Amino acid sequence: MLPEPYRLHHRADFSRTVRRGQRIGRRDLVVHAFVHTYDELAHATERHGDPVAAGSFVRVGGPRFGLIVSKAVGSAVVRHRVARRLRHMCATLVDEVPADADVVIRALPGAATADSAELARQVRSGLRKLGVTPGGGRSPAPRAHSGARPRTDARS
């Protein structure tokens, strides 16, 4: 079970993570991740009418996870089974994901027939590729080629 402080609840949090975060698709799910900074959180809080005194904003808890399991996945029973599996996987990832990250996992129709081990592998792979968990990360943009050939000295 995923404890309450580690869950995304508000529509704005889901929207921010999906729209402003990075996304990577896997066979049975799509992983969205958004890592916050202090300034972004303080600005968002001020916009909603909650003034924040300088230095008073502290995010309590750790990473937050949200799930999107639509009717395309299957019947209510199937959707809830997929959500329970994903929630359990998120609970095991709490210590690996940075505390200032929000992660949204959107289940695709194939998630209904995938087993738990396969879903876990896809979630971990997606987070690793996004650079949220150790051992991966997106490669930086390719550098522009200077046009110069590498020097090969045949002379000795």
UniProtKB/Swiss-Prot annotation:
Record PROSITE patterns: RIBONUCLEASE_P
Domain of life, source organism: Bacteria
GO annotation terms (biological process): tRNA 5'-leader removal
Enzyme's top EC category: hydrolase
GO annotation, cellular component aspect: ribonuclease P complex
A Pfam cross-reference name: Ribonuclease_P
A single GO molecular function term of this UniProt record: tRNA binding
UniProt-listed InterPro entries: Ribosomal_Su5_D2-typ_SF, Ribsml_uS5_D2-typ_fold_subgr, RNase_P, RNase_P_CS
Keyword Cytoplasm: no
Record-listed E.C. numbers: 3.1.26.5
Subunit details: Consists of a catalytic RNA component (M1 or rnpB) and a protein subunit.
Listed NCBIfam families: rnpA (TIGR00188)
Name of protein: Ribonuclease P protein component
Provenance organism: Nocardia farcinica (strain IFM 10152)
Gene from which this protein is expressed: rnpA
